[in-house]
Each structure stands twice: as structure tokens, then as C-alpha cells.
């Protein structure tokens, strides 16, 4: 099974006013994506929030979780906005210098550590570089990383960018470089004695294994690839790398749905959010049948693959001479070539399952 490590965070400037009438709080006056303006949090309120973090940490351990996650990346939410000079314009002990801007998150870390068992791990996500003029650079993180370790952090997750100015480093889409934050993570690893993980478009197990084996990082964090294939860790452990359904980093339904609608979806994996609706999938069919699928586009191939892997004898008729359907047009657009991985994977899985493909054949 998996270990649950919940990430606790005060939303700060990202608070939604319509939710229980909560007014956004921030280090300074800032406007969030909803147009709501935060008011500067007072020192007394800061001390209250720090205590609340400690109490929440205590509940995390009491609930039997395997660790505690904290977030101070992306100039985002309360800890991240305090740390970033892009958001923090205070003139008191919580603003100005890098030490003052880091004071809040360091107090949070120490308070959480005080409320946890000595060996209960604390994970901290940071931006290795905010990659924006006037934001925190790698040099600031190299200075702060040992301080985070000293305060009680057990593992650093290195992301990058900011929520508003450099989102592409947080959720790198197709067409963007794989492992965009690995360099920053590898540099931070040199100045601490705790594990350092890289975050951000690490959607290939072979690549992940390579950067770990070369000692660039101690591990990786994945999100979107586990939606495309929830069995990715098990398949990787078993050496079934070709069987892993590839994430195309399309940032489609997984990102937009999680922000706008309650149900997350995936363009690659149609079962995301519907796993309990189709309990028979993944299990052998009660009786093998002969099935004909019309069209070797992504939908037809996925249907054929699913049926064949359950034990049915499946044939695909495709009117053209190649697989792919409309996806062959889509991948011609700039930056969309990564979607070819999905098509190649479907072809591999169909062949492995024994699907017969007949080309230049109309129904």
C-alpha cells in the first residue's frame, strides 16, 4: 500500500471570499486570481496561524499518516507569499531581507516539529528558482535550504516558478522540457544532508531512474503521470516499463477540472474518477466473445485494448492505412508531438493483447 502524506497550508492571499466569508490574508496587499485583495496579516495573527499549523501537524500524526507536507513554493498561499519578494512588501521583521521573509515558514516548521515525534518526517516543497525578475533565485534557495533542514525538515521537494508569473514551471505542459527543475534540485542537494526530490514534468520512469542513479536527486515526485496510470509504481517495480501508460502532459482535464469542477478527469485515462463505476474492468470476462471495433483512432484502439485484455477476441477495421485517426492531425501542431507517445502505447498494448488490425477496410 501507499503512505499518506497530507500537505497542510494556509491559503493566505488565495483565500476565496465567498467561502464562509473568509477575507484573504497576506504578507502585503495582493490581488489573487479571483480578483480578491488580501489585507496584510498582523504579527499577532501570524503567531496564531503558526500555532494552528502545529495543531494541524499533531492531528496528521495522530491520524496515522506517514508524514507531513508543507508548501512554501510558487509565491503562492501564505507561506509562499511571505517567502517571495514578489508578494512580500512588509517593512517589519517578516519582510525585506531573505531572513525576514523566511521567518514565517521557519517558525511554522519549528512549531510543527515541536508537535511531532522526532522521527516523523516533514516534507517541504520549495521553488528552486521563481524564474521571474525580482523573485527568489537559486542562490536564495541555496542559502535557505540548510536553514530549512536545521529547523526540522526531513525532505525537500524542489519545484519552480510562480503561480501567476511562471506557471509553466509548476505544471510544464507538452512541448516543455522534461525535468525542468532537476538542475535546481541537484544544486540544492549539494548543500543539505537530507533527501532532495525533483518535481515538474517527470513523466518518464526511465528518465526518473536515470537522474536518481546519477545522483542528481534522491527521488522524484509525480502527480499527473499517476492519473494516466495509477499502477505506474507497481509496473515500474516489476520492470514492466513498456506497459506504463504515458502521461502526455497535456494539462487538460486534470488541471482545469481540479480547479473548476469537482471531478478530476484525464484525457489519457477515461477511468479517472470513475473507478468504482466499472469494477469489471481489469478483470477477465466471464465469457470470451468476438468483437469488431470500427476505427483505429484513440477511442477505438482503447476500446479494443480494454476488451482484448479482458480475454475477448478483437478485430479493428480501419478505413485508412495507419492508426491514429484525428490524433495524426493534432500532433502536427507545435509542441503537441508528445501525444504520439499515447498512440504508440495504444498500438503496443493492442498488439500485446492480440488485437487484429485490418487496414483500408470500411464497415
Task: Annotate each language-model stretch with its function.
Residues 1-294, 298, 302-314, 322:
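Flavin-dependent oxidoreductase catalytic cores
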Residues 293-360:
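Beta1-alpha1 glycine-rich phosphate/pyrophosphate-binding loop at the start
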Residues 250-258, 353-363:
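FAD-binding core/adjacent interface of flavoenzyme oxidoreductases
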